[in-house]
Swiss-Prot record:
Compartments in which it is found: Cytoplasm; Vacuole; Membrane
Topology of the protein relative to the lipid bilayer: Multi-pass membrane protein
Family, as annotated: Belongs to the UPF0494 family.
Residues spanning the membrane: 107-127, 144-164, 178-198, 199-219
Lineage, uppermost ranks: Eukaryota, Fungi, Dikarya, Ascomycota, Taphrinomycotina
Chief place of localization: cytoplasm
Protein name: UPF0494 membrane protein C750.06c
Organism: Schizosaccharomyces pombe (strain 972 / ATCC 24843) (Fission yeast)
Entry keywords, A to Z: Cytoplasm, Membrane, Transmembrane, Transmembrane helix, Vacuole
Cellular component GO terms held in the UniProt record: cytoplasm; fungal-type vacuole; membrane
Pfam families per the UniProt record, alphabetical: DUF999 (PF06198)
């Protein structure tokens, strides 16, 4: 019999004996004997359940929006990449501030360019000769000062034009570069369309070639049939042959045979394999 003291010393789960002393039996941890109806735990569990419900709600409703966002982002990247590459290329070849207003070499460069332009204009149109004739007729002629004044006036005009129109010239160059790039893109699209048209023509030509090949093959097959039928031959299908279709013929070839030739070949092979009788 079991000793009552030993029964008392047996290990029992904590709080098992106090189970019915707890007010809320449904919220009791049977292993630890603790009351689970604590406000902190209840609040945490309610918050977790709410968060899980919200996450399930958002995960069930928002995937389509996420897919749309991914597609739009891919389209934006596909459109932005060529634009950024073109802008880098264009900025490398047509940078801003090619004529810098803060450079120390601005005025000497402008003066040098003005002198070069004045001499080019004078050589082409003979401005000094024309103006000297006009001044001589009006009695303001001087062999030294008039040409100098003419060149100085031209130099000042060229210098002022370079000062005020340099930025416009740079912008004009950039705009022309953009125009050239756009024209090149349009030409590339036209060439791509022509390539597609050529590809379509190639497909049409390939289809015509396939039809011509099919017609030739059909004509060859019809001629073969006519020749076979006119010469009195019979075409044996593989289903009509009861043995292997690689049976050797009398001529040493491998071909299909009629029923009569197959039977004769089988008889010859059986006769060859039979043992020869021994003469006594």
């Amino acid at each position: 019999m079991s000793n009552p003291e030993s029964l008392k010393k047996q290990v029992e789960p904590p709080g098992y004996n106090e189970l019915f002393m707890v007010e809320d039996v449904c919220n009791v941890d049977l292993e630890q004997g603790l009351d689970l109806c604590k406000p902190e735990k209840v609040n945490k569990q309610s918050q977790r359940s709410r968060q899980s419900r919200q996450s399930l709600f958002t995960n069930t409703i928002k995937p389509q929006k996420d897919k749309m966002n991914i597609k739009t982002n891919k389209i934006k990247e596909f459109l932005n990449d060529p634009f950024t590459e073109f802008s880098k290329f264009h900025n490398s070849y047509y940078p801003d501030g090619r004529i810098s207003t803060r450079s120390n070499f601005r005025w000497p460069l402008l003066i040098i360019w003005s002198i070069i332009i004045v001499f080019a204009v004078d050589k082409k149109f003979e401005v000094q000769k024309f103006l000297s004739i006009w001044i001589n007729e009006n009695r303001f002629y001087s062999e030294i000062w008039v040409p100098i004044a003419i060149y100085v006036c031209l130099l000042v005009l060229m210098l002022l034009s370079l000062i005020f129109f340099a930025e416009f010239a740079v912008l004009a160059l950039r705009v022309t570069g953009v125009i050239i790039a756009v024209l090149g893109a349009v030409l590339g699209m036209i060439i791509a369309v022509l390539g597609m048209i050529i590809a379509a023509l190639g497909m049409i030509i390939a289809a015509l070639g396939a039809t011509i090949t099919g017609l030739l093959y059909f004509g060859h097959w019809a001629l073969y049939k006519l020749v076979i039928l006119s010469l009195g031959f019979k075409i044996v299908t593989p289903g009509d042959v009861c043995v292997s279709n690689t049976l050797p013929t009398h001529n040493g070839e491998t071909a299909l045979h009629s029923e009569t030739t197959v039977g004769s070949d089988i008889e010859q092979i059986e006769l060859q394999n039979m043992p020869t009788p021994v003469k006594k």
